[in-house]
C-alpha cells in the first residue's frame, strides 16, 4: 500500500500542499511537518514516513534556502512518537497488541495520550532550539517559483486509488474490534487490493517490499518461540522477579 502511495506521488503532494497552505514560511513548515510526521506514523511505519518526508524536506529546503537538518531531525522524533501511539504504527506495537489481544481502541487509549503529551513537549523543545536559526533563514521567492503540488501526482487515477485504499485501511483498523477482522487479515487484504488495483505495477511494488526486515522478524519469532518452549524466558522472568523483590515499579 505504502509503495503504491509513494509511486502515485501521494506523500510529495501532501507535503507540498501543506507547505503551500502555510505560504511556504519556514517556521510554520517546520511545525506542520512535525505534526504531519506524527499523524502519518500512526498508520504507516515510521521509517517509511521519514524516507518520504525527508526527500520532500530536502527539496523544500533548497527552495526556501534553509537548513533541512533541524526539520528532518524533528520529523524523526515525531514519527517515532506517532508510531508508538497506535497498534499499527510500528512492528513491535503489532506484536504486543496482537499477542495480548488488544483492539485498536484499547491500545491507543493506553499509549495515545502519552504520545500526545510527548508530542507537545517535543514540538515546544524543537521550536525553542531552532526557531531563531530557521527564522533568520528562508529566501523571499515568488509563490509561482515554488513547486506545484499537482505536479507531484504522477497518475491521477492511481493517486485516487491510493487515497481510497489508505482511507479504507484506516477505517478497517479503527473498527476491527466491531468487524471482528484481525490486523493480519486487514494488512493482507489491503496489500492484495493494492496489487489488484495497480496490477500494471504489481511486479515493481512487490520488488520494493522490505523482505530483509520481514525475514528478520520471522527469524526473531522462531528464536523467541524456541526460548519460550524450552523455558528460558520463564527462568529469566523468575530471575528478574527475585532481583526486584517482586516490586512492580522496579520490574
Regions found by a protein language model. Give the residues of each.
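Flexible hinge motifs at transmembrane-helix junctions and intramembrane kinks/re-entrant loops
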Residues: 156, 160, 168-188, 203-204
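Membrane-embedded alpha-helical segments and adjacent helix-loop junctions characteristic
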Residues: 1-67, 211-251
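Transmembrane alpha-helix interface/packing and boundary motifs in multi-pass membrane proteins
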Residues: 36-45, 76-88, 174-178
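Re-entrant/interfacial helical elements at transmembrane boundaries that shape
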Residues: 14-15, 48-59, 72, 86-100, ...
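Intrinsically disordered, low-complexity non-transmembrane regions of multi-pass membrane transporters
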Residues: 16, 20-23, 130-166, 199-203, ...
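Hydrophobic alpha-helical transmembrane segments
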Residues: 27-35, 49, 72-73, 108-112, ...
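Juxtamembrane and boundary regions of transmembrane helices in multi-pass small-molecule transporters
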Residues: 63-69, 73, 85-88, 105-154
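Transmembrane helix-bundle signature of multi-pass membrane transporters/permeases
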Residues: 35-38, 56, 73-83, 111-116, ...
Amino acid at each position: 500500500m505504502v509503495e503504491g502511495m509513494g509511486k502515485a506521488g501521494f506523500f510529495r503532494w501532501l507535503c507540498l500542499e501543506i507547505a503551500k497552505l502555510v505560504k511556504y514560511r519556514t517556521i510554520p513548515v517546520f511545525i506542520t511537518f512535525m505534526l504531519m510526521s506524527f499523524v502519518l506514523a500512526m498508520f504507516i511505519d515510521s521509517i517509511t514516513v521519514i524516507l518520504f518526508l525527508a526527500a520532500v524536506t530536502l527539496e523544500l529546503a533548497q527552495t526556501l534556502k534553509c537548513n533541512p537538518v533541524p526539520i528532518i531531525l524533528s520529523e524523526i522524533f515525531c514519527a517515532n512518537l506517532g508510531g508508538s501511539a497506535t497498534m499499527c504504527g510500528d512492528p513491535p506495537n503489532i506484536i504486543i497488541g496482537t499477542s495480548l489481544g488488544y483492539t485498536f481502541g484499547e491500545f491507543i487509549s493506553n499509549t495515545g495520550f502519552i504520545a500526545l503529551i510527548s508530542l507537545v513537549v517535543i514540538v515546544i523543545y524543537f521550536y525553542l532550539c531552532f526557531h531563531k536559526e530557521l527564522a533568520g533563514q528562508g529566501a523571499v521567492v515568488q509563490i509561482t517559483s515554488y513547486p506545484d503540488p499537482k505536479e507531484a501526482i504522477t497518475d491521477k487515477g492511481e493517486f485516487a486509488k491510493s487515497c481510497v485504499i489508505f482511507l479504507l485501511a484506516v477505517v478497517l483498523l479503527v473498527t476491527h474490534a466491531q468487524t471482528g477482522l484481525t490486523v493480519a487479515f486487514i494488512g493482507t487484504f489491503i496489500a492484495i487490493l493494492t496489487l489488484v488495483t495497480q496490477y500494471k505495477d504489481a511486479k515493481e511494488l512487490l520488488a520494493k517490499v522490505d523482505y530483509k526486515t520481514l525475514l528478520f522478524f520471522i527469524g526473531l519469532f522462531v528464536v523467541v518461540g524456541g526460548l519460550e518452549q524450552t523455558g528460558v524466558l520463564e527462568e529469566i522472568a523468575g530471575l528478574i522477579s527475585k532481583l526486584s523483590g517482586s516490586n512492580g515499579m522496579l520490574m
